[in-house]
Each structure stands twice: as C-alpha cells, then as structure tokens.
Amino acid sequence: MTILLQRAKFKKRLMPILFPLMLAGCTNLFGSNFQDVLRNDANASSEFYMNKIEQTREVEDQQTYKLLAARVLVTENKTAQAEALLAELTKLTPEQQLDKSILDALIAAVKRDNDSASALLKTIPLAQLSQSQTSRYYEVQARIAENKTDIIEAVKARIQMDMALTDVQRKQDNIDKIWALLRSGNKTLINTTQPEGNVALAGWLDLTKAYNDNLSQPSQLAQALQNWKTTYPNHSAAYLFPTELKSLSNFTQTQVNKIALLLPLSGNASILGSTIKSGFDDSRGADKSVQVDVIDTMAMPVTDAIALAKQNGDGMIVGPLLKDNVDVILSNPTAVQGMNVLALNSTPNARAIDKMCYYGLAPEDEAEAAANRMWNDGVRQPIVAVPQSDLGQRTASAFNVRWQQLAASDADVRYYNQPDDAAYNLTADPAQNQAIYIVVTDSEQLMSIKGALDNSGVKAKIYTNSRNNSSNNAVEYRLAMEGVTFSDIPFFKDLDGEQYKKIEAATGGDYSLMRLYAMGADSWLLAHSFNELRQVPGFSLSGLTGKLTAGPNCNVERDLTWYSYQGGNIVPLN
C-alpha cells in the first residue's frame, strides 16, 4: 500500500511537467507548424495532395497542400494545372511564400522564360533554404542553363543539386540527367572544359572522356569505366553509377555462329519476306562463317518455327515479321529463353524482355523525327494533321510525346477522314500560318491537301512523312510540292549509286519494297552488333534505313534523313 501511494504522489507531481510537453508535441503535429513539410521533399502523387485539399478545413493547411500539389504537377508535365492552383493562393505565410517563389521560378524555367526564372532566383535567400529547397533552387539554375544549351553550366548546377539531395532515387535521377547532358555534348567541349578546382566536375569530365574514347571498342569500355571508379572512389557517380552504364559491368561482345531467319516466304506476305531476305543476303555477302537457317513462318506456326530453330542450334532469331507472330513470342517469352531475338516488327504489347529487341520501319520513328526537326527549325506551335486511322493515332501520339519532352506543351493535333477535311481544318485557322506536319498514306493525299492550302492563301511551312515519296511521282508533282520537307531513309540520297541501281532493278523501282530491302540489309548489321546495341548506351550503326540506336525496351530507333522539294528535284538536307 505504501508503495502504491508513493507512485500515485510521484505521478501527481510529474503531470504538471508532462502536460505542457504533450501539448507542445500536439502543436507540432496539428498546429501551424504543419507548413514545415514545405521544407522537405514532396513524395506523394498530385492526386494525393489534391484529395488532402478537399479534406482539410484550415485555410493555411489547404494552401500548403496546394503548394505541394503544384510542385508535383510540374514534375508530371502538368504545368498549366500547377499555375491554376498557385493562382488561388492568398495571404501566404513567409514559409509558404518562400516555397512559392521557388516553384514560380521552376515554372518560368520549364516555360523557357529564362529572364523571369533568373530574376525570381535572385529574390530567394539561398542561405535560409533547407536541403530539399536548395536542391530545387539549383534545379531551376540547371534548367535555365539547359534552355540555353549551356551543358557545362547545367552540369555545375546539378552537381550543387546532388550535394543537397538526400533521397537515393532523386540522387540517381539527377546523376542520370548529368550523364545525359554530358553525353549530348560534343567531344571538343568535353575535352577542352577546365574543371577549375571543381573535383566533382573533373570526375564527370573524365568519366565522359573514358566513355567517348572507348565507345567504338565496347569490350574495352567496361575496363575503362572500372579504372575511373578506382581514380574517383569518393565521387557521387562512383556510389550511384549512371543507370545507362550499369549494364556494361557484364558486357560480352556479340558472337554470332548460327542465325534463324523467320520470315513469311509463301502466301500473301511472301513479297515482303522475300524482299527483306534479299537485303539480308546481300548484306551478308560472301560471309559463310555464320550459318543461316531460313524458316517460312507461313508454312508452320511460329511456335514450331522457334522450336525448329532451337533444334538446329541457332543462337539468334531474326524475325518474325508479322505482328501476330511477334505477339506470340510476347505472350510466352520463355519459348525463346537463351536466344537473342531481333523481332522485325513491334506491337502495342511490346515490352522489355531480356535479349530481345524490336526493329522495323515504324511510322512512329518518322513522327518523332518530325518533332525534332520542327523544334530545331524554330517551330514552337506546330499543327499536326493525321488521318483518322491507326496510322494517325500512332503518329499523333509519338509526335506529341516527343513534343512534350521538347516544349513541355502539347502539339495541336487535328484528325481528318478525307483530304478535303484536312484542308478545311487547316484553313479554318489562318492565324496558325506557321508550320504543319501532315501525315499521308500516299502522294495523292498530299497533293490534294497542299493544293487546297495554296488556294486558300495559307503560307505555312509543310513537313510530311515518307509515304508521299514514290518512284511514280512525276516532275509535275515535285514542282507542286515546292518547299515541302519530308523524312525518308538515307538510302535514297544517292540515286546514281551502283547499290541503288541494283536494288531498283530487283524491286522494279517500288520505293516501299526498296525500304524493306534496306531493312533486311540493316537487320544483318544489327544481328552482328546485338549485345553492343542492347548494353552500350549511345552505340549506333549507320545503316541504309538510318542511324540506328536502341531506345526504351530495346526498340531500335532510326535517325532519318530529311529531303526537300526544290525546283522539281528532291534535295537531301543536312
């Protein structure tokens, strides 16, 4: 009993001390100090923060959630929505106003308003920022430099950003961006830049030099990168290696002994398969060191063709060509386990599968190339006219995805059923006489659309795809297309060359078949550099269908050649 009374008296004396502390703790959790979260990273989705705005009654806390939501919306490429949220804010606390200033500067940089972004940064007291806010401050500096294509200044800003970042994933993302910047720089810039005592910059420059100097010899590249790690053991990139370079640790040079070529060589698609095979065979030439087993996918199910290739001991499959057959592999990738596969088509189901790449003459490549070309030509408000079809949907999506990456905004996409529809949609908005990317299925469509635009007085610069380019086009067509720019494979640059004449005779001058022939020729090249293509970032091959590199999911991307109609002739452009 005595012990119990003593405990009761002790608790009674302790409560006056603990109670204020408990209240103080509650204030930190529920009171005005909630806005301290602005000093930290925003790790949730914009949807999460938007829901919190609706659930919260305190105006001050609502505004904090709006700032967090706007911050994430910018990272989700939803700048307009972020600006709309910021416009709702009133009577901010000093901490909220500080966070908004950083966000306003970032939005200005995203919109390429460098002067406004720089002016806003000057109003921000850098010494008062948390580590998270400091990283965001330097991200704005980096974006301003990136807008000016000042690679080294952008890298310097991101090095400062790296020093402030604490989250591992954010550090990895930033390291990957530094690496992408340096990889985009030419060798002269990298080799002549002086680090001026900046040890981190010196490490990045040496890493880039090691990569550039050994890119043509991938077997030596892995060792060069390991030597760099030994030289810079404390460098941030030594702890978190650029994601692109991680696959090089287990790189082995491509060795091809036996190839299974899976093509439709009978039935309705035989003309496609036989043309690709001709290109493949001619590229192979007299090289008999590699055995090629040709399998007709029209004569047996593709599953049986794969089983036959395995039975033959083929280590690599080139093909299949038809999309349905590619989907068969995608639905059961274990069927090709242990084999390299260069599929000659892609489907909406395509995804990253170990030792599998996708190569074809996809219209998406042309759409992405058009976005790049128009951006480099100074176009900022493109109109994209595409047919209301699968081709139109795919090209419009590919163009817009690339345009969002370049301009942080959507392209103006307009669909048409008939050429007359396209002409009407384009002439109905004369204020947009800037530049139009027109996707057509043949030259007659382009003739109709351009004729209507000319008659209506629209003076927009016209870009288009390769399907307008046909051997059947007479000089009258080429004159009518004066000034039109289009993309196509580089093979068509030399119409007087011996190789062109040979293929022209073999295909009857049909440009569609000539493109397939070139694809077959390039598939031989790709097969012999398969590991390099998959594992060495930036590795490229100069083929008949373009400069070939591996994109996401090992989808082979083609850097196309641009041509222009000038004085009745087709002139290659730089």
UniProtKB/Swiss-Prot annotation:
Record field: transmembrane: none
Subcellular location: Cell outer membrane
Record membrane topology: Lipid-anchor
Keywords, ordered alphabetically: Cell outer membrane, Cell shape, Lipoprotein, Membrane, Palmitate, Peptidoglycan synthesis, Signal
Source species, domain of life: Bacteria
A GO MF term: enzyme regulator activity
Signal peptide as annotated in the record: 1-25
GO cellular component terms attached to this protein's record: periplasmic side of cell outer membrane
Annotated lipid attachment (S-diacylglycerol cysteine): C26
Keyword Lipoprotein listed: yes
Pfam family, one: LppC
Lipidation (N-palmitoyl cysteine): C26
GO terms of biological process kind: peptidoglycan biosynthetic process; regulation of cell shape
Function: Regulator of peptidoglycan synthesis that is essential for the function of penicillin-binding protein 1A (PBP1a).
Subunit structure: Interacts with PBP1a.
Family, per entry: Belongs to the LpoA family.
Protein name per Swiss-Prot or TrEMBL: Penicillin-binding protein activator LpoA
Organism: Mannheimia succiniciproducens (strain KCTC 0769BP / MBEL55E)
